[in-house]
Structure formats: C-alpha cells, structure tokens
Amino acid sequence: LSDHLTLLATDGSKRVRLMQAARAQLRLPPAQVLEWRDWLRQPSLLDAALAQPGMFKIEPPGDDTAAHLHLLHDGCRLLGRPPVRDPEHGELLLMDTWFAGFAAAMEGLASQLNTLPQTRLVNAPAEIVAMTDKLACQQHLAAHGVPVPTLLGPVHGYEHLQTLLSEHQLDRVYLKPRYGSSASGVVAYRRNRAGRQQATSSASLQRVDGEPRLFNLKRISRYESESEIATLVDILAKQQLYAETWLAKPRMGDSHYDLRVVTIGGQPAHRVARIGAQMMTNLHLDNQRGDATSLLGPADMAALETTATLAASAFPHSTLAGYDLVVRHGQAHVLEANAFGDLLPGLMWQGQDTYTAQLRHHHEQ
C-alpha cells in the first residue's frame, strides 16, 4: 500500500487514533499529523509536510479551541465585523463568521496544494467547503438530480418564519443553521390551528447575565412558549438559518430512524441506521445504531444505494463522504452531506472499518 499519508488534524483526536490503528493493522507507517493550529499560524509547514509524494487528508479542527478561535477571528476580519468575545464551550455563536474564516482557510489551502502536484487528495478543499455550507450543499445536490427535502430558503427571524409557514400552508418544518454540524442548532418546529407551538432542538437556551445564549447539548430540549421559541429562532437566524419541509422518518416500534451511508470512491459502502425516539437521530445524541440490511427491504436498499451513488457523483473530487438519508416506500432523500462523515468506530463493511476501507481504496487506485 502507498506508504505516506499526512493528516491536517488534531493530534490525539478519535479520528487520528482510528486512522493510526487502521494503518498499523495494514502494517503501514503512522500517518504524519500537521496540527490545524500550527498550519493556520504558519502555512509553510504544509509545504514541508508534503515534500515527499503521498496522500493528504483534511480532517475537521474538532476539539482544537485555538484553531476554531483563529478561524472565527479571521472571519470577523474578512466580514468587516468588530472583534468578538470568545464563545464558551459548546456555545452556538457566530457560526456564519466561523464559516467565513474556514472557507478562506480552505481557499488558501487549495492554492498551496496547487503547487504540490505530487500530493493526492482524499477530499478537495473546495468540496469540503461546499458540504459545510448546508444550504448551498442541498441546492447543489438538487441541481444534480438528487432528491432532497423541499427547501423553503433562508429564515430571517421568528416573524419571518410565521410568514413563510403561512405562504407555504405548512404547520411543521425543520430549521437548520446554514453552517452547523452534527445537529447543532437544528430545530424541529410545529404549530397547530389552536395556536400551540413546539420547538425541539439540541440547542439549550440559557440566560447568562440576563442575555439569552444558546449552547449545544447532547440532549434534546423542548420549547412551547412563544417568547422562548422566538428567542431561539432569532438567535439562530442572526447566524444564517434556513427551512426545509418536514420529512417523516420510517418508524420502528416507538422509535424512528434515518440512515448514514459512507461512500468511498463514489460507491456506497458502510451504512448504519440511526434509531431514536426524538426528532434528531444523530448517534452522538445517545441514539442507537441499527442494522440497515435488516431494516430495509430490497426496494428501499436499492433506493439507498442509487441515491447515495448519485449524491457522491455531485462531488467528484471527494473520495469519501457521509450522507444522511430518509428511505421509505422505495424512495430515498438526502438530508445532509458530510465531508467528514467517516467517524463511525467499529462499523464494518465487507470486513473493514471506514478507515481501513479508505486506505485500501487508495492503494487500489
């Protein structure tokens, strides 16, 4: 197998540990790790790291607070915004500003990589950015014929949400931060004719020194008062929020599920059902894994594979991606694409985890 792999990552993170374990299993030398924070401070470190031919994989900054703050402060500068206080741990703050810094960093990285033709990329920076902008990503998938939930466009605040619902004659929608990840800030909103409403989210609304703030928690919160829901939506809308139609997920007993499929080299590989009683079925929210093969009949499995393949073809310069799908009645819709969707410890496909499978794929190429 190809010997040399460099990761732009956070050393010691779960992603790095799983990749190093896969390399050890295949009797490959450990991957070289370039820390995000170091590269952001001194981009020339990348040129040195990639001096010899090999593979290069971009992982997310993860738990590297210094890297996230660097991106946030770069975003402020690029958008002409005044310097901001540092977000507290888990706080949903200035996601759009962070994204501006992240997109600029990826653009700079792409320029650097253009001078290093001997380096083979796992995922191209431009496509990582495209998948991180959730609204643009869904529009991109739809333009390539991939079925997605109907997009209702940006939401500018609570009052605008009410207008949108009335215009489209809807009483329930999903609200998603344009630059969020892992269900952070996603809101399942519904109202009825009697005027009652409910918002369900992993975003926890807290008051700090009298100021409302949002924190991403690994548990679901429910809001039923108009003032709390309006505050929740308004805070998220300031960071760019969009709405999409509510797609019912198939049920299994008292729970419902969607599916994560990892594509490698454009082909569907690892797949897992994400089963939960709550609206959000993300696995990090204490939901359960389920066996996709036992849950899906032949027509649904065919729809899953066809749709995942079509979605992957919309990102031809991404060897690897995770897609979240709702599959029912022989139809599949893509809820989200994730350029970093391979963090599924222990999930096997044809006897290999996601990290071993991607290393083998690169060797075969």
PLM regions with names:
Residues 2-6:
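Extreme N-terminal starter segment of soluble prokaryotic enzymes
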Residues 9-12, 38, 155, 179, ...:
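Short, flexible loop/turn elements at secondary-structure junctions
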Residues 10-155, 159-163:
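Conserved N-proximal alpha/beta basic substrate-recognition cap immediately N-terminal to
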Residues 23, 241, 318-320:
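PAS/PAS-like sensory domains
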Residues 120, 173, 269-270, 333-336:
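Protein kinase-like catalytic core scaffold
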Residues 165-282:
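Phosphate-binding site of ATP-dependent enzymes
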Residues 260, 322-324:
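Short, surface-exposed charged micro-motifs
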Residues 275, 282-320, 327-365:
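C-terminal active-site "lid" helix and adjoining low-complexity regulatory extension at the edge
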